[in-house]
UniProtKB/Swiss-Prot annotation:
<comment type="function">
    <text>Plays a central role in chromosome cohesion during cell division by preventing premature dissociation of cohesin complex from centromeres after prophase, when most of cohesin complex dissociates from chromosomes arms. May act by protecting RAD21 and or REC8 from cleavage by ESP1/separase.</text>
</comment>
<dbReference type="GO" id="GO:0000779">
    <property type="term" value="C:condensed chromosome, centromeric region"/>
</dbReference>
<feature type="region of interest" description="Disordered">
    <location>
        <begin position="628"/>
        <end position="648"/>
    </location>
</feature>
<feature type="coiled-coil region">
    <location>
        <begin position="95"/>
        <end position="122"/>
    </location>
</feature>
<feature type="compositionally biased region" description="Basic and acidic residues">
    <location>
        <begin position="200"/>
        <end position="217"/>
    </location>
</feature>
<dbReference type="InterPro" id="IPR011515">
    <property type="entry name" value="Shugoshin_C"/>
</dbReference>
<feature type="compositionally biased region" description="Basic and acidic residues">
    <location>
        <begin position="490"/>
        <end position="509"/>
    </location>
</feature>
<feature type="region of interest" description="Disordered">
    <location>
        <begin position="188"/>
        <end position="239"/>
    </location>
</feature>
<feature type="compositionally biased region" description="Polar residues">
    <location>
        <begin position="306"/>
        <end position="315"/>
    </location>
</feature>
<protein>
    <recommendedName>
        <fullName>Shugoshin</fullName>
    </recommendedName>
</protein>
<keyword id="KW-0175">Coiled coil</keyword>
<feature type="coiled-coil region">
    <location>
        <begin position="208"/>
        <end position="273"/>
    </location>
</feature>
<keyword id="KW-0137">Centromere</keyword>
<dbReference type="InterPro" id="IPR011516">
    <property type="entry name" value="Shugoshin_N"/>
</dbReference>
<dbReference type="GO" id="GO:0051301">
    <property type="term" value="P:cell division"/>
</dbReference>
<keyword id="KW-0132">Cell division</keyword>
<dbReference type="GO" id="GO:0005634">
    <property type="term" value="C:nucleus"/>
</dbReference>
Amino acid sequence: MYKKVVGGWFVYLVSTQISSGRAGSARFGGHLGYPSPSVAYIMARASRKANGSKAKSNSVQEYLDLISLQKQQFDQMRANYSHQNTQLAKSNSMLMIKITDLETKISELVQENVQLRSRLSVTELRFKERLNQSFNLLEHGAFQRFDEIVNLFAVVRAQQGLRPESAAATEQAQRRFKGLEQRGVSPKVVGFDVPSSDSVRGERETLDDRAQQHQEADSMELNVEETQPLRKKRRRSSRRESLFIPSDFDFSNDSLENALKEADKSRSAKDEAPSVAEDTITEEKHRESASRTTEQGESESRTKEASGTLTQSNEDGMGNDKSLQKEGTQQEDAANFTHSIIEYFIPEEYDVGSSDVANTSKSKLEVYRDDNEIESSQSTSSGECKELTGELSSAQPPFVQIPASSQSKIKHSLKPPRTSQRKIVVDEVMPHNDYSDATRPRRTRGKAVDYKWPSLRAKMRRPTDKLVDATTVTDIHELQVPTNRKLRKQREGVADSADVHGETDHEQDPEQSPAAEDVSVGLQSINSNIQKDEVSDQPLQATEVTQALPEDLPLRQPMALKDITNKIHIVQKPKKSLAKKPIIGDVSDENSYYGDDTSASGLRLNEGDLSVFDLIGGVKCSNIPKTHRARAKAERQVGKKPAFKVST
């Protein structure tokens, strides 16, 4: 009973029932009055046990409820955490994907940045190289121009017999120029060197030395090295190169050469430093001067002859003093000539420099001028040359002319445009209907087109109203092939009627071309042959058509090209109709195989007579059986019928 305890109330009921039963049994057992003490003790003990078990069961139940509640909370928290973990995993995966995309994009951007930097560096390097080249070119050109000016001054000094500049200053200038040429690359930073006191003193001393040398120069003597041709400098412009050729103005005189040789012997011991001309002499110029010695020899012979003719009248009463004066006058003439030539060429250099476009690149631009400007410049230059020669010839004896070989070497960059190589473009003109033989400018670029007669396409095809040549003379409708039979027959009839009436048309139109006459004659002969072959019973179709046509409709005359473009429509012979009285029973007739095969109408002798088969009614003609079996069957069904043949 105590093992199956559910609650406190059930235990209490059981204990009360037991106690009541025992009391009854004691009563009924003969014991009346109060119960015995043993029963009370048992009841008290049972009540105590029931209270203890009740308290224990309550505590266990509360513990179990608490455990179940904690378990539920734990499961719920675990589910929440698992769901949160899945969401975090998803977000983490998305973030990782985005991070990888960002990494790829960053790597692409880095590569692009590297490429852009490399391109930028390459472009900067190229720009610096171009800038450096342009600066080097400008510097080289500027120094070259200054060098040309210095050389020009030196040549003028040498020609005039002046003493040149000191050798130390010229060497210093040449060293500077050579140093700049060897350096090649201009410095990025321009530095200004402050001269020291020692350098200033040295320059002052050199200036004092120059002044003393100029004061000590008593005689104006020419040096052999100075008169020799200068080194042919490398110039950018061939026109500048052609302006002044010093070797062309070297005048060889025996007396002058002897005087120069003596002066050279006297001054060879004094001058230790080389002059400017010695540094500029090259082997190329020596070769050119050697090649020009022959030309100079001819010029010397001419000058000797000219001077001999002038001085023959004065040689009789003159002595050594006259010869010395003659040599002096020749020197003065040569100097004046060179001076005039230099003065003549210097303004031309200025004009060319001012008029031409500045060329910064190495390649030479081709500058073209108009013919009027070229002719005016040539006329002015020839006028100036004539004025110079007139002045010199009037005041001085004739001098040596410049040889033709040196003039042929002069190069000119300003050339007129070549008009012979250009294509002459002629405006195009539309063709006219009148086929005149007058010449007119053609528009075609390749070959001439003849518009007089229709092209081969118009002859070979059947054109329509849309596809017609613009210059065709023939009628399109005559070349067409009509699909309608009525129109075709009508046109054939019109053509035949035109052929029939060709004689009248020919008489009416006396101005017709001979080609049209020949065509009409040929057509008439053909039509006459056709008419002979036709049956006399059938009337002509052409006359019927011409009668059916209205009078106002003009007939088409035969064209000149009708025999070329059109085919002659030959009228076919009509099929002969069966005669009214045919010959029946002809042995040679192909159609009469058996008498029963012929039709009833074919056996009539006359239209009004009765035929043989009219007498026999219900007889039908059948085809001839081809096989023996079919023929026997036919004979069995229908008795044998003799072939009715009419003998003639």
